[in-house]
Every structure is written in structure tokens, then in C-alpha cells.
Amino acid sequence: MAQLAGQPVVILPEGTQRYVGRDAQRLNILAARIVAETIRTTLGPKGMDKMLVDSLGDIVITNDGATILDEMDIQHPAAKMMVEVAKTQDKEAGDGTTTAVVIAGELLKKAEELLDQNIHPSIIIKGYALAAEKAQEILEGIAKEVSPDDVETLKKAAVTSITGKAAEEEREYLAEIAVEAVRQVAEKVGDKYKVDLDNIKFEKKEGASVHETQLIRGVVIDKEVVHPGMPKRVENAKIALINDALEVKETETDAEIRITSPEQLQAFLEQEERMLREMVDKIKEVGANVVFVQKGIDDLAQHYLAKYGIMAVRRVKKSDMEKLAKATGAKIVTNVRDLTPEDLGEAELVEQRKVAGENMIFVEGCKNPKAVTILIRGGTEHVVDEVERALEDAVKVVKDIVEDGKILPAGGAPEIELAIKLDEYAKEVGGKEQLAIEAFAEALKVIPRTLAENAGLDPVETLVKVIAAHKEKGPTIGVDVFEGEPADMMEKGVIAPLRVPKQAIKSASEAAIMILRIDDVIAASKLEKDKEDKGGSNDFGSDLD
């Protein structure tokens, strides 16, 4: 409602909530900080897990920031921006999702303190933008170059990523799998390497222990051989991939065939059989002894394939067909009649095996496969899911290093270095922006402080010790949460890709700046149905309760 010459003017529908100026900023900052506080306790190797139960009673137990925020049904728009920070970090860097959200929350906390001192949001925004830009430059300066062939360093980065997750006991073993998988599918483009993570397939099966998790240099497909008479094991396999059905197709036109005698019916059936026989003969003729079909296989075609000793699998997913092509070197053929010996792929072994009581097809021993499978095992569904999340993060971290060739110490070391250097930079900038840059630097200390806090250490005492050691010994000094003392993270093998902190600071600062720009929130009243679903409230601020 507005007033013009003493007359109230209604421009928004009834029930609309509006928050202006400091109220709007305070509300948004509070919402974003609540999200950051929620996942702060999961940060680091000693971080705790969260148990999330959805409306159907399904349970997720994890300490992965992106997963936690994805599973939470967050309503507040400013809080949703924090979820986007985690999603962007996960997509771009693969790890550091909790770090990014915690930094964003702390930046907003420090911004609120500046707002309380009557510093204009525009000045804070400018200072934060300058600090974020300078931070990228500082990180580039302290990064160490590493070769994609340095397996030990890649493994250390993978171990750092897995530490603190449910799969921690097997971190060395899982790190080896992650490194081997990425190096196998990496392709050289010019003088750089590119890794397409779509070429690494994750298959999960409950049962056995996490140590039974294995890397298959080929593809594992959750299907079974279509006919009991077919071989279940084929060595020196010649593999055909058919993107069609081994069936007699129905015509597209609504034609009718009038059959007036038994002879005509017999001829019709014989022709159908002949067509199916020709398809199978073609597969045999080109030398294939294993065939994967994206669609169905007629019963008669199955019979002939079994008779010829050809293993066949039907209704294979398109994504699996593409992985089979990359692993075996086969070409996907649309029509069986176009199949040639050159289209066939090769594998040392194709075998149907029972895993956790279910049949699966293993295609192994491919020559230099550009698609691999990680078969994940674990005692329960929750363990298997968390091992998958840990491996996905580890694989992404290794990918970052292989592609960029640069690493940093972890354990809060980069954030401490940034805090020290940005404090110096703030003095060069001067003006009111100096206050914002100093606030940015102070906000970054939340990472080493939280790492210490989550490990049961005194956060203030630990931070003072680490900063003193860092200034004395250099930018690789961070928080050793196991010993409770400052330590050289590079020597300890606690490392991360350069891409992770760079993206975390970029995403966090952009989100904080976006939230600080908002000085007016107009929230329409919810529809009646939504009100019932949400318990009848249409108060925008009530989403924070």
C-alpha cells in the first residue's frame, strides 16, 4: 500500500508481504546464514554426518554439502541461492561444496556488521568484488604445478577428498580406483588432457564389504542373457552393438492382409521366420559372438542366436551402448543388414555373473578402453550410497588436477594465506572499501576455525597458532585436525585441486553480492492449495522458523 495526497493507493493484491531496506537485507542474510550454519558441522575430515528423512520415510545419511542441501526442501528464496552455490561448486569443481556455502554465510555475516555501521551496500559490494578478484590472483600465485602422470599426488588428492566420509576406512583403496579410472578415460587434446566423467559408470550392489568395490576396465551392465541356451561366458569376444530390434517390424500404414487359405498363412509365417533368420545369419556371418541390442529380440531370433552359440542381451540403455562402443571400439549400427566385420568391438571376456543374487553382464579386458565401470559394494544401502558419493567427489578432484595440472595445500592453508594477503591489499586500496576487503579476509578464517571446531579443538587458540606458524613458515601451513597442531599440508599429503578453492570463493562472493544488492522483497500470497500444503501460512518470513 502506498499513499498519494493522503489517499491510500493499493497496488499489490491482498496478503502480499513486503520487506524494504534493512528489513529485507536482514531477512535475506539471516536465511542464507541459517543454511550455512546447518551444514557447517559437516566440514572437514572430523565433520559430522546429517540424517535426512523425506516425506516418504526414505533416509539419506551423508556429510556431502551438495547432497544435504539438495535433499532439504528449502523454501526461502535467499536460502535457495545458497543451494545454488553448492550446486555450482559441485558441477564446476566436484568438491568443496560445504566450504563454498560456509564462506558465503560468513561473508554475509561480516556484511551485516558493516551495514550496522552504516556502510552502504554498494561500498561493501565493491570491496567484496575487489577482494574476490585479488583472491583468484593470490591462489594462482601459491599453486604448485603437477603432472597428470604423477600418480602419487593424484592419489593424495583423492584420499584428502574421501577422508571424513563413510568410506574413510578404505580411503587408500578407493583413491587408487578413482585415479586409475580417470587416467584410463583421459584423452589428450593438444597439450592438455580432457576427462569426460560420463565415461566412468557407477554401478551399485548391496552386499559384501566396501573393499570388494572394483574397477572394471570395460563395462558392467545390469542385464542378463536373454535365452537359457546361450553361452554365459565368451572369451575373445567379437561384439556387435545394434540400435534396433531383432524383430519383424510392423508397417507404419494401416494395411490389412486377407488370408483365404492355410497355405497362405503358412507362407506368411515362413516369410516372417526367414526375415528373422536372415538377421541372425548376418550377425553370424560378420563373426560376432556377442550382441547387445537396444530394443527387443524376438523369441525365434533368440532361438537361432542360441543355436549358433551367440550371447545376446536386449533392452540395453542408450548410455550403456555408448559406453560399450567407447570401451570395445565397436560402432553402433542402426540396421542389422548394415553390419560389417569392421563394426565389431573386442573384449577378452564377456561373462554373466551373479552379484548380490542378481545377474550382471561383465565386458572386461578391453584394449585401452575409453569407458570404465566402478562396481560399488557395501553392507547396506546407505553405505553403498555414501561410498558412491565419496568416489564421485574423488573422481572429480582427480579430473580437476589432470585437466588443470595445479594443486594447493588443503586444511585451511589457502584461506589463511588469502586472509593475510587480503589484509595487506586492503591497506593499499584505502577508503571505505578497505573495511569491506578486511571483512572479506576475516570471513575466510571461518574455514580453519570450523575445521578446528569440528575436530573438538579450541577454535580461537588453534587459529592464532596456525596464523603465527603460517606467517613464519609459509603458505603451506594449515590445520592438522588429527594432531591438533599447525602442520605443512603439502608434506602431510593433504592437497586439493586449485579449481576447488578458486570456484568456492568465486561462487560464495557472487552469492553474497547478489543477496546484498536486494533492498526490497515483495512476496505474493500463496495459493489456497499451497497454504493448505504448507500449513496455512503465507508469511514470507515464516519460512525461517
UniProtKB/Swiss-Prot annotation:
One of its GO terms (molecular function) is ATP-dependent protein folding chaperone. InterPro entries: Chaperone_TCP-1, Chaperonin_TCP-1_CS, Cpn60/GroEL/TCP-1, GroEL-like_apical_dom_sf, GROEL-like_equatorial_sf, TCP-1-like_intermed_sf, TCP-1_chaperonin, thermosome_alpha. Transmembrane segments: none annotated. PROSITE patterns: TCP1_1, TCP1_2, TCP1_3. Gene3D superfamilies: GroEL, GroEL-like equatorial domain, TCP-1-like chaperonin intermediate domain. Pfam families: Cpn60_TCP1. Keywords: ATP-binding, Chaperone, Nucleotide-binding, Stress response. Belongs to the TCP-1 chaperonin family. Forms an oligomeric complex of eight-membered rings. Molecular chaperone; binds unfolded polypeptides in vitro, and has a weak ATPase activity. This is Thermosome subunit. It comes from Desulfurococcus sp. (strain SY). The lineage of its organism: Archaea, Thermoproteota, Thermoprotei, Desulfurococcales, Desulfurococcaceae. The gene is ths.
